[in-house]
Amino acid sequence: MEPSPAKGKAQGRLLVSTSLDAKDELEERLERCMSITTSITNGLSEREANDALTAHVCKGPQQHEEVCLGLFTLLLTEPPQAQRCYRDLTLVNRDGMNVVLMKINQILMEKFLKLQDVCRTQLVWLVRELVKSGVIGADGVLMTLMKQIAGGDISSKNLWLAENVLDILVDQREWVLKSGMLVAMSLYTYLRLIVDHGTTSLLPLRQREVDFCIGLLRERFMECFIIGRDLVRLLQNVARIPEMELVWRDLLHSPQTLSPQFTGILQLLTSRTSRKFLACRLTPDMETKLLFMTSRVRFGQQKRYQDWFQRQYLSTAESQSLRCDLIRYICGVVHPSNEVLSSDILPRWAIIGWLLTTCTSNVAASNAKLALFYDWLFFNPEKDSIMNIEPAILVMHHSMKPHPAITATLLDFMCRIIPHFFPPLEGQVRQGVFNSLNFIMEKRVLAHLAPLFDNPKLDRELRSMLRERFPEFCSSPSPPTEVKMEESVPLEMDNHVLDKEDGCYDNTDATFSDDEEELNNKGKKREFRFHQLKETYIDEPSDITPFVDQLDEALKERVLQLQKGSDTETHCEVMQEIVDLILEEDFDSEQMSTLASCLAELFKSHFRGDVLPEEITEESLEESVCKPVCLIFRNLCQMQEDNSGFSVLLDLLAELYQKQPKIGYHLLYYLKASKAASGKMSLYESFAQATALGDLHTCLMMDMKACQEDDVRLLCYLTPSIYSEFPDETLRSGELLNMIVAVIDSAQLQELMCHVMMGNLVMFRKDSVLNILIQSLDWETFEQYSTWQLFLAHSIPLETIIPILQHLKYKEHPEALSCLLLQLRREKPSEEMVKMVLSRPYHQEDQFTTSILRHWTAKHDDLLGEHIKALLIKNNNMPRKRQSLRSSSSKLAQLTLEQMLEHLDSLRLSLSNTKNNFFSQTPILQALQHVQASCDEAHKMRFSDLFSLAEEYEDSSKPPKSRRKAPASSPRSRKGAAPQPCNEEESVSSSASEEEDSKPKASKRKRKGSAVGSDSD
């Protein structure tokens, strides 16, 4: 089982990398596990190897994980051994493949694009085998793999992945049909991909995709129904394909043939599409880049990011179909938090406007407009979200001045879609658009619509059509001065002033929102109308009618008691009875999902409002965890993990998590705040593994993100526990750190620093801190300063992170350079520090190297002189073409002789009018003389002023009788005066050293000059 050695590659065997990339932590870990595994089995027969591995995994959890990950890595990197490794893996694993599933999920979400081709092929093969074996959790992995199939991409790699995933779904059809979510996600994915596969060469693949989708729609329509209204949008795009047309006709005219429970297309169109489906059609990389633009990029500075995104994802004719996916994602998933509404972050409408204006295909442009208005058509204020309809009105509003054609096109589309979308439902569509416009005004997204609908920049025919369709919104507002003021704002630039006045939501924090999450944000600086919006939803009665009749009588009775009851104590008693019922042996597990839907609806008010008490005391904390939903947590804490009821309650929580994702961070809060849960934080890991995500890291990051969006105080409260309990998930990357520093204020930063200083919180460790600081270079200014302050609160030696200097550019990374500069000035320079400082490329405007060197000349001149001498002589002696290969500690450190001379010359100029005698030191003058003797004429001429210091030193070393003139002794009477660089004592010392170099016969001075003489030789 020993892997064949890598063929002369400096990079790892899993990921594609360059010599400049830092070693990937995940890759290092996996290769280390592979090495351990091969060392155990090396030279053994198959049976002996299996016995040895089995014995090793029995030693403990760590050894079990090492062997599982070692076999997993071997399987990815050694195709000939894959079957054997998988067989061994199934025999030795003790956790239902959980360790492997978690690693696959991590690789798919974080490293898939960097995987070597062989490893990518093997990973797909492994997923196929896991599905064949019916491993619990394989459906989650398969859905993550499907997410990597990019829309609008017909490259060979993407087609290969689409075809292989389809093979798995078709070959394992019976297994697929057991998971309703997998059925829906597969249908959503391949209905979308069919659009991209219309060329002649791809028709065989498209036909297979069509057959697969029709099979799911015919056999499992109600599972497909959970997609919601976007299922109709996707079917419209493929309805011209003959086989699909038959399904489309049945959908419109014979709904009962698809399912007895399906009443008609209106039932589907009034159902909102979950964000899970809208997000599944963006690859993790696309999603990351889009979230970066909507959460980190300032308005007005977006062009270079948009250009990059355009080149990467939207540059081909086929990729135009991706625009509707992006717009649906922005409208339905990327929702702003209250804390950033007044910031200058790039708003959603600006990105959508850019996507519309850069579209090069008429069909794609039409689909993009439909994607933008899709939630308008059947909008119901009681069920749908203002956040989904807001971008369209703001695109039109803000485009009126700079791009009136865009506004006109969208208004025209809005008018014409009413009669043409589906004529039998024209009345419902008109009502939906009317509801949208009315809700927009009610929530003051815009103060008035008349300036938009009756604008003189619109042509007469369009204005007439708008007045005819929407007379209610075309009357002039009162008082007219308000409209005049609003119109005077330069919309294309000063949109944020207008946003504050009109209550716009468009400065997003790029958060993943639940269906109701937009109502629950906890921004403190909000106008009262938004608090009213929250109250409206809180007072809304819970509607559990669709679910409650599916429960058995005992459960139904308790659930109805919960609905009728009002006080918390009664709710808790009933909830305990429900828990007791589901723990009974005869409980029907098929009711779990329905029960979770009821509980999520009944307890939705528990997930609004602040979780953490204003004043934190033992009593207030205990009181805060006395909600009915916390009874599930408490029962879990009281059980042993091997108890059968433990897994049942985890299943209930996992179902609840699908309906209400906020339950994740509520569980974390309970485990920290409740006395009953003391020392039970590991329960969260069991919960994460029980969810559809099946991955602790992903689950934890999503829950902390949800917490960040809802309650920053709670985020800070949880932070010490999360870092201490889950170090492998929190310390290996900067993901959680970025969440924290993105929202904390200066007081919360100081509080976290105190936790670090007292030893309650560790946010960095030596092996990963450098990578995290490098990641932070792309963050905002305050986020970077906060990160550095937290780093400095730790007792990590500066040498650990000094290689970051190689990544810092003086124009792009002033925050990191400032923090490093202040820290370096407190340090005593080591040779490695000096080397890294001098390794920075020389720019006249970049004063970093000169400033720290100058500071060190004042505080540690002797030490600095010795280090510079050693580096100068070492680099001067190196073969010129191989300097970078001889670097002592960092692949990035490419210290060249020319760089050193440039920085020293800059330092010389900086010190020229001071009394600093740094350049009169013997080591410096010896080194300069050594370099001058061997460098070429071009360098001698370029650095002549620097080398002249050594020449003057050489002249002063001659016998007294050969001195030129009496004034040569004048420095004695005016020590340190410019431009003379050295005092009398240093001259004598220098003379003594240099005389050894120039006149070896003077044996009495040999001791002082021996080091230089040896180096020169």
UniProtKB/Swiss-Prot annotation:
Residues 952-1017 are annotated as: Disordered. Disulfide bonds: none annotated. GO terms for biological process: DNA damage response; DNA repair; mitotic G2/M transition checkpoint; response to ionizing radiation; RNA polymerase II transcription initiation surveillance. Keywords: Cytoplasm, DNA damage, DNA repair, Nucleus. Belongs to the Integrator subunit 3 family. Component of the Integrator complex, composed of core subunits INTS1, INTS2, INTS3, INTS4, INTS5, INTS6, INTS7, INTS8, INTS9/RC74, INTS10, INTS11/CPSF3L, INTS12, INTS13, INTS14 and INTS15. The core complex associates with protein phosphatase 2A subunits PPP2CA and PPP2R1A, to form the Integrator-PP2A (INTAC) complex. Component of the SOSS complex. This is Integrator complex subunit 3. It comes from Danio rerio (Zebrafish).
